[in-house]
């Protein structure tokens, strides 16, 4: 109990089932907030990519397996009908869970998560990612509010989830002040962003860009521009 972890989960067949748009961001943020509160898991960083998810969390009560099962199940139940599909939403393997043993491990993985869209050649800065992405400035700040998506969840009834869920991004334990940790995250993130830009320039390539990311088909593994983001 009390360990910190990098948690990752891929969509089935690497399909872009979590392609970023307002509905997907609202849904995942809401369910993450609900799950974190229910299982008392502390969230430090999150990035929802088109075909996978990364979280950095601390698990004070050793409830991480229940947390991931609950979150993954609700995301699948909501997104599948939204996409007009009924097959498995997630890849058959379970979530990848990597224990973070030192403060340096935690800092490195938080920066890794936030730099994911940049390292993948999608956007030049992590903050430009149109999906759910936790900014360093949100660490230790006011909770982020997500309204319950009315397009899937019941508004009334004994089993109804809360109308508003609040996600609080907290500083990992043992890493000093909030301000110091934010600065360290920003510095590490910027270093990755600079390296990614240099690598693309060397390869004579460009970042894909938000418009093309959102125009990808949810069901393609490659870059297949078909329609605008409507899910």
Regions found by a protein language model. Give the residues of each.
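Short catalytic/metal-binding and nucleic-acid-binding patches
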Residues: 1-231
């Amino acid at each position: 109990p009390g360990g910190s972890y990098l948690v990752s989960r891929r969509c089935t067949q690497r399909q872009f089932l979590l392609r970023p748009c307002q509905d997907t961001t609202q849904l995942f943020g809401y369910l993450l907030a609900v799950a974190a509160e229910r299982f008392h898991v502390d969230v430090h960083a999150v990035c929802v990519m088109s075909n996978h998810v990364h979280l950095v969390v601390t698990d004070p009560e050793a409830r991480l397996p229940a947390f991931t099962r609950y979150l993954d199940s609700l995301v699948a139940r909501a997104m599948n009908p939204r996409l007009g599909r009924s097959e498995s939403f997630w890849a058959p393997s379970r979530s990848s869970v990597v224990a973070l043993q030192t403060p340096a491990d935690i800092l490195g993985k938080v920066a890794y998560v936030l730099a994911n869209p940049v390292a993948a050649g999608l956007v030049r800065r992590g903050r430009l990612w149109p999906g759910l992405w936790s900014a360093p400035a949100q660490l230790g700040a006011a909770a982020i509010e997500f309204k319950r998506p009315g397009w899937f969840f019941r508004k009334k009834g004994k089993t109804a989830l809360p109308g508003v869920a609040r996600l609080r991004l907290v500083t990992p334990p043992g890493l000093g002040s909030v301000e110091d940790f934010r600065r360290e995250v920003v510095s590490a993130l910027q270093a990755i962003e600079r390296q990614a830009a240099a690598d693309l320039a060397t390869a004579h390539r460009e970042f894909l860009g938000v418009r093309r990311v959102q125009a990808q088909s949810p069901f393609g593994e490659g870059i297949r521009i078909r329609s605008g983001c409507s899910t």
